[in-house]
Amino acid sequence: MINHLALNTPYFGILLSVIPFFLATILFEKTNRFFLFAPLFVSMVFGVAFLYLTGIPYKTYKIGGDIIYFFLEPATICFAIPLYKKREVLVKHWHRIIGGIGIGTVVALLIILTFAKLAQFANDVILSMLPQAATTAIALPVSAGIGGIKELTSLAVILNGVIIYALGNKFLKLFRITNPIARGLALGTSGHTLGVAPAKELGPVEESMASIALVLVGVVVVAVVPVFVAIFF
């Protein structure tokens, strides 16, 4: 019955995405934002487990899932809003911001590429991993454009964000990074959306820098990843 209904309506995929995310958001707040209960991570795990246990094929979910994905690309326009609001900070520290984000993103791409090549991952897997520095709304279109697997890219983005959310501030202490601009840029560049949360806990400067990094990293990924693909593949 479930399978029959799912095959004939996109509502199944939409509800399987939205309801677990909504419930996970409540759980996330109730547990004092415990990193393993990050909404994206929980809803992803639940969705995969549900499809596996019920035997419903992924293509059935994808009918509704593609509708949500359709709205991701125009949603990227919204990222211009926080950038505009923080334009004074951006102008004042533009050289540090551009330098930090540019170098950080390129180094991250080189590390991913080197590790993946040493591990002898298939090319489509490597291509799926490269855009993970950007937030999901930007990473998925980039992945599709270079021949990656969108679903694998989504997983990489989420896991990357969860790790930075959980350990980002610990890494800053480990490497004794105390400058608020550097700390904010580091968290925003490495952890995208989830990286802003620990930056907010550190202070307003860190939060501003992380928010700016979140947007600009997406721009760098869009510009640089295709160049990496052209050079190394």
Swiss-Prot record:
UniProt xrefs under PANTHER family: PLASTIDAL GLYCOLATE_GLYCERATE TRANSLOCATOR 1, CHLOROPLASTIC, PUTATIVE SEROTONIN TRANSPORTER
Induction: Regulated by the two-component system LytR/LytS.
GO cellular component, one term: plasma membrane
The keyword Iron appears for this protein: no
Topology of this chain in the membrane: Multi-pass membrane protein
Bilayer-crossing regions: 5-27, 34-56, 67-84, 97-116, 126-148, 155-177, 210-232
Subcellular location: Cell membrane
Entry annotated with the keyword Methyltransferase: no
Gene name, Swiss-Prot/TrEMBL: lrgB
Keywords: Cell membrane, Cytolysis, Membrane, Transmembrane, Transmembrane helix
Protein name from the UniProt record: Antiholin-like protein LrgB
Source organism of the structure: Staphylococcus aureus (strain NCTC 8325 / PS 47)
GO biological process: cytolysis; killing of cells of another organism; programmed cell death; regulation of single-species biofilm formation on inanimate substrate
Protein family: Belongs to the CidB/LrgB family. LrgB subfamily.
One Pfam family hit: LrgB
InterPro entries (UniProt xref): Antiholin-like_LrgB (IPR024891), CidB/LrgB (IPR007300)
Predominant localisation class: membrane
The organism's place on the tree of life at top rank: Bacteria
Function: Inhibits the expression or activity of extracellular murein hydrolases by interacting, possibly with LrgA, with the holin-like proteins CidA and/or CidB. The LrgAB and CidAB proteins may affect the proton motive force of the membrane. Increases tolerance to penicillin possibly by inhibiting the formation of the CidAB holin-like complexes within the membrane, thus reducing penicillin-induced lethality. Possibly plays a role in programmed cell death (PCD), triggering PCD in response to penicillin, and possibly other antibiotics, and environmental stresses.
